[in-house]
Regions:
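C-terminal helical "tail/cap" subdomain of flavin- and related membrane-associated enzymes
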Residues: 120-229
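FAD/FMN-dependent oxidoreductases across multiple families
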Residues: 13, 35-122, 127
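Residue-level detector of alpha-helix boundaries and kinks
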Residues: 4, 100-103, 107, 153, ...
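FAD-binding core/adjacent interface of flavoenzyme oxidoreductases
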Residues: 1
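Short secondary-structure transition/capping segments
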Residues: 33-52, 170-188
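Active-site substrate-recognition segment that forms the wall
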Residues: 6-38, 92-93
Length: 229
């Protein structure tokens, strides 16, 4: 497949599996789950082996696909609304301030936003006024990240339940517009809680080209299954 593929399945509830191409005949394949889902870290190896054998995944993988290395797992911090953001002249950004999305585990966009916000705060307040710079940075994190974080955490809890998950996917599958914008929203082409924060509204906020322009090969495929993938 020349594009990103995402799988949802009952045993990955509040999580998902993915496949996306890399340069050459390579791909990144993996899955993520919430620690609160009841699945133990030690069970992830078993889930991984089973995931690779599922028909939906096999249909995307090349028949002769082989891993380059052993599979690995690591925790992703997602608590930007509960950790210190500064310590005098030190500003915490990215993973250091747990700025990741509670739904997807995505953290690259949050790292860029928090890093840029820290630099802008220092530039605005001046290098000799750390207290003022810290206050500017705190406000920027609240504006850009905290509302999105809390909204994503709320939605993640809804998706933990079968009725909520099925309802969300049915709504996303209504038409081409909802499918396209669900994929863009899920992977944060625009802020998670954009519709709830009018201060961030702008003309064309749902129609821009996004992080990557479509080269004609397709952008994203979302697959829903009522049984394991």
């Amino acid at each position: 497949a020349p594009h990103l593929v995402v799988w949802f399945a009952p045993d990955l509830r509040r999580g998902y599996a993915w496949w996306f191409p890399l340069p050459g005949p390579r791909a990144n394949v993996g899955f993520g789950i919430h620690r609160s889902s009841g699945v133990k870290v030690g069970d992830m190896g078993r889930i991984w082996a089973d995931l690779l054998e599922r028909p939906g995944v096999q249909a995307v993988l090349c028949p002769d696909a082989r891993p380059e290395d052993r599979h690995k797992a690591w925790p992703i911090p997602a608590r930007v609304d509960g950790l210190p953001r500064t310590a005098h002249r030190v500003f915490f950004v990215g993973d250091a301030v747990a700025a990741t999305d509670p739904m997807t585990g995505e953290g690259i966009a949050q790292a860029l936003v928090s890093g840029r916000s820290a630099a802008d705060a220092i530039g605005e307040a001046g290098a000799t006024n750390p207290a003022a710079a810290a206050a500017v940075y705190e406000r920027a994190v609240d504006h850009h990240l905290t509302t999105d974080h809390r909204f994503a955490r709320f939605l993640a809890k809804l998706l933990e339940h079968p009725v909520g998950a099925r309802g969300a996917l049915r709504a996303a599958d209504t038409n081409d517009w909802t499918r396209r914008n669900f994929a863009r929203w899920m992977f944060e082409d625009y802020p998670r809680a954009l519709v709830l924060t009018p201060s961030r509204w702008r003309r064309g906020m749902f129609t821009g080209p996004g992080a990557f322009r479509d080269d004609g090969a397709g952008v994203t495929a979302i697959e829903r299954t009522d049984s394991p993938v």
